[in-house]
Amino acid sequence: MATKKAALACSVCGSRNYSKSVSEGKRGERLEINKFCKYCNQYTLHKETK
């Protein structure tokens, strides 16, 4: 399986703070993780973008 890079964007302010390698296999939904956003200065939900 090949891997691609996906950016994780803050759901509050929209800034793309993190990048992650994900496999291109059978994935039904996008990745959602609670991470720290340095612009919001709090832990928020980060969603996978292209």
Swiss-Prot record:
GO BP annotations, alphabetical order: translation
SUPFAM superfamilies reported in the protein's UniProt record: Zn-binding ribosomal proteins
Entry GO terms, CC: cytoplasm; ribonucleoprotein complex; ribosome
Alphabetized Gene3D superfamilies for the sequence: Ribosomal protein L33
Keyword Zinc tagged: no
Keywords per UniProt: Ribonucleoprotein, Ribosomal protein
Key word Metal-binding present: no
Listed GO MF terms: structural constituent of ribosome
Membrane spanning stretches: none
Sequence similarity: Belongs to the bacterial ribosomal protein bL33 family.
Protein name according to UniProt: Large ribosomal subunit protein bL33B
Gene from which this protein is expressed: rpmG2
